[in-house]
Amino acid sequence: MKTFKLVDLNVERVDKEEQSIEQFPLIDGLIINKEDGENHWLIEALVQKEHLSFFEQLQNSQSEAKVFVTITKKSNRPAQLTAAVKNIVKLEESIQVLLYGQMVTRKQQGTETILESLVKEGYTGTKLIEAFKQKL
């Protein structure tokens, strides 16, 4: 197994027919490559307690979500995983979220999802380009 620093976490939110990418500012985080030949990864993210309901809903639904992670440096391109919430630990001022999933090898699909989300959020022109570069 190899462990890396997690520097950015985004999860696709699906509400009825509406899709968007929810960004979760990290207090701290790690991502572990299980090196099992199946491309499985374990994500441990420490985020503010205000995000508890989102992760609890995802955990209770027992479904997988598209997760976009940036590893080691903010300048790296986000990697896409299909992951499920396995555990949530409530701390005093934050929560620890454990996600387990599989890396998606098609990077283009993740890029398209990010762009679609930004357009739906109302970004256009140079602001769209700036926001898109920031997500990449």
From Swiss-Prot:
One Pfam assignment: YwpF
Superkingdom: Bacteria
InterPro entries assigned: YwpF (IPR025573)
Protein name as annotated: Uncharacterized protein YwpF
Gene (name only): ywpF
